[in-house]
Amino acid sequence: MNSQELKKRQENIRNFSIIAHIDHGKSTLADRILEKTETVSSREMQAQLLDSMDLERERGITIKLNAIELNYKAKNGQDYIFHLIDTPGHVDFTYEVSRSLAACEGAVLVVDAAQGIEAQTLANVYLALDNDLEILPVINKIDLPAADPERVRQEIEDVIGLDASEAVLASAKSGIGIEAILEQIVEKVPAPSGDVDKPLQALIFDSVYDAYRGVILQVRVVNGMVKPGDTIQMMSNGKTFDVTEVGIFTPKAIGRDFLATGDVGYIAASIKTVADTRVGDTVTLATNPAAEPLHGYKQMNPMVFAGIYPIESNKYNDLREALEKLQLNDASLQFEPETSQALGFGFRCGFLGLLHMDVIQERLEREFNIDLIMTAPSVVYHVNTTDGDMLEVSNPSEFPDPTKVDSIEEPYVKAQIMVPQEFVGAVMELAQRKRGDFVTMDYIDDNRVNVIYHIPLAEIVFDFFDKLKSSTRGYASFDYEIAEYRRSQLVKMDILLNGDKVDALSFIVHREFAYERGKLIVEKLKKIIPRQQFEVPIQAAIGQKIVARSDIKALRKNVLAKCYGGDVSRKRKLLEKQKAGKKRMKAIGSVEVPQEAFLSVLSMDDESKK
C-alpha cells in the first residue's frame, strides 16, 4: 500500500474501549459486538470470550485488558476497522484501564438500567475524560423488570454531566441495540490522528511471554509503520531487536504484512529477557528513530505489601521466575527478595490492592504450580526517627526500635461509597469503626447517596470491602484513591512463642486497639498451634511490655500409672523427674507454626468487632 492508500485506510479506523462498573454487562456486550461483526464463528463463541484466564471466567471479572480487531460494514456502505480494547472494571485494576484508554479515541460507557451509576463507573469516566476520549453512553439491561432507563438517563446527565439524549438503550444479553452502538462508534468516535510518513512511534500497552517467541509486545501505532524485517529500538533503554512477525488479534493472533498508524496489534522480535521491555515504553525504528518518546503512563505505586514464601524452600527460584513473568504484563506488581526466620527465603511483593493480591496469589498457584504462604498485608508507613530521618517502612519486622521513633504517619484514602439511603447509617457506623473521618454526603437521586470518608488504608486492607458488602446487602459500590499521609498513634506488636519473636506474625496496630487485638490473637493462636511435649507461652508484646499472654499446656504422660497406692514421696519423686525433663525440653525445644496461624492474623478483625 502506498502512503495515500494507508491514509485513506486510517480514516476508517476506530479505536474504542468499553468502560463500566463490575457486573454492568461489559464482557457480554463485547461478546455481542464480536458476534454482530462476525469476528468469531458461532461455533467458537462462548460467554465472556475475551476473559481468557480461567480465573477471570470463574470470578466473572475482567483482570487483563485485551485488544481485538473487528471489521464492520456500516450503513453508509463503507468498511471500517474497529479495535475493541477490553478493560477491567475493578478498582484495583484502574491502572489497566488507564493503559487501555491511552490506546483509544473513544469509550463506550455502559450503565446498568436498573442500578444506575456506581462508584467505579465514575472513576473510569474521569479517566476517560482525562484522556480526552469521546464518550458514548449506553444504557444496558433494559429488559430487566427493574429497569428504569429514563431515570438512568437523567442520572448520567446530572452526575457525570454528559448529554445522554442520544444514549443507546440496549440489552447485551438479548442482542438489542447492538447495531445502534456500532453506528454511533462510526459517527462519533474520531479516526486516529498521526502520520504514516513520520518515524515510527508505537506505545507498548501490554506484553506477554511466549516460550517459543520470547516477549510479544502489544502496541498501538501512533505514527509511522512497522513490518517484519525492520530493526526496532526501545526508547527507554536503546536496545534493538529484529522484528520477526507483526499481526493483530481476532481474539487469536493472526500475522500481517505491516502495522500502520492507528493500528493496534502485536510485534514479535525474539526479545529473550523480560527486563528489556516495559509497558508504557515507546518503540521506534533503529534506522530512523523518532525524536522523542510518546507520553507514557504514570507509574502506579503499590499500596499493599505482603510477603510471599514458597512452602517448599527449593521452589524459591521457580517463584522468582514466575514473578518475573507475571510482572511482564502486570507492570504494577513489584517484588524484592526477603528472608524470615520463621518462613525462610521469599519475596516482599507490592500490590495495588487486595483483589490484585488475591489474583496474583491464585495465578502463581495455578499457572506455575507453586504452593505459597502469604503473610498479613501491610501498607507503607512513614516513620520519623529521633535523629530527624524519615524511613519508609512496609514490613513490620523492619520497624525501628520504639525508643528511636519520634512519630509515625500512615496513608489515608478518600473513600467514595455509593449506597441506597436505608443503608447510610450502617455505612457510617462501619467507617467510624475503621477510624474514618466524615467528609461529605450528596444525594444522587431520591434514593441513592454518595458518602465520602477519609479512612486509613491499613483499615481498608483488612476486610473493609467484605464488611461493606455484608452491612449493605451487597448494594454499596466503593472506590478509593490515596489522599494523604497523617500522623497516627501506631505501635508495632510482636508475637512471642516460647519467648522467641516470630517475625512473620508481627503487625502494626493503632494504640487504641492494641490491647484487644493482642488478646484476641493470642487466644486464636492458642487454638491453632498444636500442643507440644512442653508448656508453650504465647505472648503479645509492644516493645518490652507484654500486653497479653496465654499458655498452651504440655502433653504429658501419666507417670503415676504404675504406683498403686504407695508412698506420696515416691509419687513426688516421679513427678519432679518429669518436670525436670519438661524444663530441659523447653530450653531446647522449638515450636512449629502452622500455616493457619499466619492466616488467623489476617482474619483477626472479624471477631474483634463482634
Swiss-Prot record:
Binding site for GTP: 23-28, 140-143
Annotated Gene Ontology cellular component terms: plasma membrane
Positions of the tr-type G domain: 11-193
Entry GO MF terms: GTP binding; GTPase activity; ribosome binding; translation elongation factor activity
Keyword hit for Magnesium: no
Record keyword Endoplasmic reticulum present: no
Lineage: superkingdom: Bacteria
CDD domains: EF4_II, EF4_III, LepA, lepA_C
UniProt cross-references to InterPro entries, sorted A to Z: EF-4 (IPR006297), EFG_II (IPR041095), EFG_III/V (IPR035647), EFG_V-like (IPR000640), EFTu-like_2 (IPR004161), G_TR_CS (IPR031157), LepA_C_sf (IPR038363), LepA_CTD (IPR013842)
EC number assigned by the record: 3.6.5.n1
Compartments where found: Cell membrane
Membrane topology recorded in Swiss-Prot or TrEMBL: Peripheral membrane protein
Top class in the EC scheme: hydrolase
Reactions mediated catalytically: GTP + H2O = GDP + phosphate + H(+)
Cited PANTHER family: TRANSLATION FACTOR GUF1 HOMOLOG, CHLOROPLASTIC (PTHR43512:SF4), TRANSLATION FACTOR GUF1-RELATED (PTHR43512)
Similarity annotation: Belongs to the TRAFAC class translation factor GTPase superfamily. Classic translation factor GTPase family. LepA subfamily.
Its biological purpose: Required for accurate and efficient protein synthesis under certain stress conditions. May act as a fidelity factor of the translation reaction, by catalyzing a one-codon backward translocation of tRNAs on improperly translocated ribosomes. Back-translocation proceeds from a post-translocation (POST) complex to a pre-translocation (PRE) complex, thus giving elongation factor G a second chance to translocate the tRNAs correctly. Binds to ribosomes in a GTP-dependent manner.
Protein name: Elongation factor 4
Gene: lepA
